[in-house]
């Protein structure tokens, strides 16, 4: 599966600890329906079996909205649930093992924070890289902040590999990334810690569209659902055609 820079625009990473009893799948669908362009299932306290179960439940939602969906770290869960791929950190499974287990058609993303890691990602043929941490983050307490200068240098090494900035990024600080060469932002608490995850996603989608120069037709229906003409709008057109018995040609 080919990953583009546009896919990196708004990369949502799950974390159920922020949900405070809200239904996980309902929140995930809100995020997918309101502008997330990529989704990663990342639940560090979940068992392998729980990850597979959640992934299988999310998979049809991601397909419905046309959003690439990967699992953090667990390559065997990614294979069992048959999701789009996996994201591996520097302390997780190595790229060659992941590729052997998942096959050539699956997405493999890698975390990059040093020149050596950047060179390795290019050499291995990573489908995309997550670069950072850009800011201090509670999800990775041992991560060191990557300076703006280092970020620019590392993105310059990536050739045609899409880059998403990671680590402590939110609506208020993402302007810092303009001109660094990254294609988008990965966020956790900036969406999932918000009381209204749908609104948080819409706000970030609109801001990143402007920040990274992605032009999209943004329309909202009467319920506040963002109709992104591609693919959400197409999904809604298909649904309405089926409901009223029109033929789709």
PLM ranges: what are they?
Residues 1-95, 100-128, 143-146, 153, ...:
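Conserved N-terminal beta1-alpha1 strand-loop-helix module at the mouth
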Residues 16, 135-137:
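A short, flexible beta-alpha/helix-coil linker loop
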Residues 125, 180-183:
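As written
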Residues 131, 164-169, 185-189:
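Glycine-rich beta-strand-to-loop/alpha-helix junction loops that act as flexible
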Residues 134-135, 183, 190-191, 231:
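Flexible glycine-rich beta->alpha loop in the catalytic core of nucleotide-sugar glycosyltransferases
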């Amino acid at each position: 599966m080919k990953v583009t820079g546009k896919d990196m625009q708004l990369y949502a990473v799950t974390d159920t600890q922020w949900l405070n009893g809200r239904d996980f799948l309902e929140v995930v669908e809100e995020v997918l329906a309101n502008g997330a362009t990529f989704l990663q299932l990342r639940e560090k306290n979940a068992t392998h079996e729980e990850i597979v179960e959640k992934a299988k439940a999310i998979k049809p939602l991601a397909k419905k909205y046309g959003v690439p969906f990967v699992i953090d770290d667990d390559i065997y869960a990614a294979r069992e649930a048959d999701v789009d791929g996996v994201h591996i950190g520097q302390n997780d499974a190595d790229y060659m093992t992941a590729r052997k287990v998942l096959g050539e058609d699956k997405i493999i993303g890698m975390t990059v924070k040093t020149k050596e890691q950047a060179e390795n990602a290019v050499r291995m043929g990573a489908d995309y890289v997550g670069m950072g941490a850009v800011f201090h983050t509670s999800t990775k307490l041992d991560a060191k902040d990557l300076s703006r200068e280092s970020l620019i240098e590392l993105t310059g090494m990536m050739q045609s590999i899409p880059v998403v900035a990671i680590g402590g990024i939110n609506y208020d600080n993402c302007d810092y990334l303009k001109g660094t060469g990254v294609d988008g932002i990965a966020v956790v608490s900036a969406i999932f810690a918000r009381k209204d995850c749908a609104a948080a996603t819409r706000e970030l989608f609109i801001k990143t569209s402007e920040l990274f120069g992605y032009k999209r037709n943004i329309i909202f229906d009467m319920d506040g659902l963002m109709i992104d003409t591609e693919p959400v709008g197409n999904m809604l057109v298909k649904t309405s055609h089926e409901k009223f018995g029109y033929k789709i040609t």
